[in-house]
């Protein structure tokens, strides 16, 4: 009985037509979003590189939050995860605007995040990238203060790439970055 119900629901969902221009209307940024630099959004490599570049900079340097916002599809989310003080896993979803509102903290202390490895898979108009990163307060810092993995979901609308979500977790005791995600930055080729 349960199996028949699942099959019926799946068949119904698959047979429902998409509303006209659904993907095109979803791909457009919010009305106030700035136009993207074509180089930033021409490829999966380009948009991932732009993500790291736009949030990085020395103490006192303003970030280009208009450029940052231009990378995201309307409705995009950034989703940090981690452990609370009670050691339980936590999750919080924010919009690109909410993330940018925290920009003064990065600008105050200095913040550099760079990709240290990537695996990516593409199917049709979607790409998923596991992008390993390290974070430093200054580009010249010998050791990072944090490392982790950004799980980045991208969408290509036929004219450009968009960030749909960035979902990340930090490396910590008992949660090291697996070696298979290190050493191949910029590897999607899309």
Model-predicted regions and their roles:
Residues 4-17:
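Bacterial N-terminal signal peptides
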Residues 23-70, 182-189:
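Short, low-complexity N-terminal intrinsically disordered segments enriched in polar/charged residues
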Residues 51, 68, 76, 129, ...:
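Hydrophobic pocket/interface hotspot
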Residues 55, 72, 133-135, 167-169:
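Short beta-strand segments enriched in hydrophobic/aromatic residues
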Residues 60-65, 69-88:
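Early exported N-terminus immediately downstream of N-terminal targeting peptides
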Residues 77-78, 82-141, 190:
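Surface-exposed, charged secondary-structure patches
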Residues 89-92, 140-144, 172-180:
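A short, polar/proline- and glycine-enriched secondary-structure boundary/capping micro-motif
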Residues 147-176:
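Short beta-strand edge/turn micro-motifs at domain boundaries
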